[in-house]
């Protein structure tokens, strides 16, 4: 994996790119950090879409929280 400092820098750059109005497709296992910078997302479980919606809706979805936030 990447060092925490490098991950932090990558997310910072992704936010800056998106702030310019450029759409970013991000595939990432760190759901909490990814949803914090996302507008909309898809959550996969065993290769299938288990949920989709706004970042806020996904972060409050009980199934997503159970699977990805412990």
Locations of regions flagged by a protein language model:
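ABC-family nucleotide-binding domains
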Residues: 3
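Helical segment within the ABC ATPase nucleotide-binding domain
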Residues: 7-20
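H-loop/switch region of ABC-family ATPase nucleotide-binding domains
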Residues: 28-29
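A short, surface-exposed alpha-helical micro-motif characterized by mixed small hydrophobic
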Residues: 34-36
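Short, glycine/charged-rich "phosphate-handling" switch motifs in NTP-dependent
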Residues: 40, 52
